[in-house]
């Protein structure tokens, strides 16, 4: 009850205050009074220079993340029914015969190859000593052979026609020169023999005519060189480690 009485009294006081307030009691018939705006000059604040604050680099250790285990996902095999492709019949392609003219290949002259003689030094083989083998004499008794009497057989003379033998061509055999090491012979002293001077008449040699040799031009076909394929060289990317540059302050500390 006391609370209700206090609430009612407070409400009455509030209503009285609102009614008796000067805004409610103001006379609205009077025009408003003009008040010019008051100019407030701006206040000058000099700029404050703050020296740069040096913040050392913060070391952040690398965070190691454990590997995440992903169980294998089972994918059932997808059944693809076989696709029937009917056979394609291609008509035979007629290729007319290509005429290739005969290629003229001139004879290639191969000069004879001269091989120098191969020198093989004599190989020294020491004599092998073989001791004499003793063989006892074998006794053979004499065999008696009675004399055989053969009557003379008459052989008529046989006529043999002369056999024609064509000449056999034997190619010249080239024997490589045999190397004979020089044999040292001591000088033999021979007394000088006097030979009277012999006068030989001059021998006339007629000039020999050598006809000019005509050599046919040698045809050298152009040599085709196929292009050489050079596979691309793989150069792995070069990874340069990051260069750590410590942060420098914009102004040296203590300059202000």
Curated annotation (Swiss-Prot):
Q: Which GO terms describe its molecular function?
A: structural constituent of cell wall
Q: State the residue spans of region: 44 X 5 AA tandem repeats of P-P-[VIY]-[EYKP]-[KT].
A: 31-250
Locate the region Disordered: 233-256
Q: Looking at the UniProt record for this protein, which Gene Ontology cellular component terms does it annotate, in alphabetical order?
A: extracellular region
What does the UniProt entry say about where the protein is found?
A: Secreted, Cell wall
Q: Where are the sequence repeats?
A: 31-35, 36-40, 41-45, 46-50, 51-55, 56-60, 61-65, 66-70, 71-75, 76-80, 81-85, 86-90, 91-95, 96-100, 101-105, 106-110, 111-115, 116-120, 121-125, 126-130, 131-135, 136-140, 141-145, 146-150, 151-155, 156-160, 161-165, 166-170, 171-175, 176-180, 181-185, 186-190, 191-195, 196-200, 201-205, 206-210, 211-215, 216-220, 221-225, 226-230, 231-235, 236-240, 241-245, 246-250
Q: Which Pfam families match?
A: Extensin_1 (PF02095)
> Mind listing the UniProt keywords for this protein, alphabetically?
Cell wall, Developmental protein, Repeat, Secreted, Signal
- Signal peptide range equals 1-26
InterPro entries xrefs: Adhesive_plaq, Extensin-like, Proline-rich_CW_protein
Give the family, as the similarity comment puts it.
Belongs to the plant proline-rich protein superfamily. ENOD12 family.
Outline what the protein does. Answer: This is a developmentally regulated putative cell wall protein.
Q: What protein am I looking at?
A: Repetitive proline-rich cell wall protein 1
């Amino acid at each position: 009850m006391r609370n209700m009485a206090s609430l009612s009294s407070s409400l009455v006081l509030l209503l009285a205050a609102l009614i008796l307030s000067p805004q409610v009691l103001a006379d609205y018939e009077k025009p408003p009074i003009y008040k010019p705006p008051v100019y407030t000059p701006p206040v000058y604040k000099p700029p404050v220079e703050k020296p740069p604050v040096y913040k050392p680099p913060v070391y952040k250790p690398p965070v190691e993340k454990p590997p995440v285990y992903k169980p294998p996902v089972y994918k059932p095999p997808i059944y693809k029914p076989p696709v029937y492709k009917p056979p394609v019949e291609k008509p035979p392609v007629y290729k007319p015969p290509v005429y290739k003219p005969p290629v003229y290949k001139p004879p290639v002259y191969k000069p004879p190859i001269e091989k120098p003689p191969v020198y093989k030094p004599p190989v020294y083989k020491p004599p092998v000593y073989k001791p004499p083998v003793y063989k006892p004499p074998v006794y053979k008794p004499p065999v008696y052979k009675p004399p055989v009497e053969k009557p003379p057989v008459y052989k008529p003379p046989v006529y043999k026609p002369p056999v024609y033998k064509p000449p056999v061509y034997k190619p010249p055999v080239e024997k490589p020169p045999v190397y004979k090491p020089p044999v040292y012979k001591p000088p033999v002293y021979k007394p000088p023999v006097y030979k009277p001077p012999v006068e030989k008449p001059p021998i006339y040699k007629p000039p020999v005519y050598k006809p000019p040799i005509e050599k046919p031009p040698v045809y050298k076909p152009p040599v085709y060189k196929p292009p050489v394929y050079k596979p691309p060289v793989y150069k792995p990317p070069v990874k340069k480690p990051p260069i750590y540059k410590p942060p420098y302050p914009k102004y040296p500390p203590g300059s202000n």
